[in-house]
Amino acid sequence: YNTGVILTGDTKGVTVNEFNGDGIPDLSFTVNNGSVSTFLNTSRKKFVGVRIKGKEGNLRAVGATLTFSTKNGTTQTIEVTGGGSYLSQSGNTKFFGLGDDVSGQLSVVWPDGKKFVLNNVKQGLVDLMWN
């Protein structure tokens, strides 16, 4: 897959996050002995960004499972983890592609087993807090 991003130098860290409030995932990179570079996604693809917040003792809601289903039958699942990869860390915003759909259903199973369902979720950002 060609991202269209070209970096020079010894690039070690990357994060996918939502930096400008449009609900589309953006990229940020670090280069050894260099500055941070951020690339805002200018594609016309449709995404739902879910910002998830935990509670005391598990502020990142590690162990939560998010499932997004569209009307055309596409299902995507993401588990919230506590790590990333070498010199990287996963952000608290999780992204789901809408494809040709305009909305879908978001289901969350929190680390304590409680379930929450949100219907008719459209492109953009959704904030969820574990209660």
What positions do the PLM features span?
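Gly/Ser/Thr/Pro-enriched helix-cap/hinge segments flanking short amphipathic alpha-helices
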Residues: Y1-N131
